[in-house]
Amino acid sequence: MEETVKIITVNDTTEIHIRKSEFQGNTYVDVRKFFIPETGEPQPTKKGLSLNPGQWEELIPEIKEVIG
């Protein structure tokens, strides 16, 4: 099961998708860049990060510290 939670438009050819998914009974949150071709659906790129909720809880405070 995969659910898109949020889509952030970067520009005409790029979006960032935040998705929640389950794999082998585990929950993951994936933040990934998508390329938007002139015709067709947005396509995922290799640029992204998929972590379980506990890993995101550890990472988010560190990101907040870096960006101030």
Task: Give, region by region, the residue ranges found by the protein language model.
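Gly/Pro-rich active-site loop or hairpin
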Residues: 9, 47-49
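Negatively charged, low-complexity tracts enriched in Asp/Glu with abundant Ser/Thr
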Residues: 1-11
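Short linear motifs in intrinsically disordered/low-complexity regions
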Residues: 12-13, 52
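Generic detector of short, locally flexible boundary/turn motifs and exposed helical patches
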Residues: 13-17, 58
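Mixed-charge, Lys/Arg-enriched low-complexity segments
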Residues: 49, 53-68
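A short, structured beta-strand/loop element
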Residues: 16-47
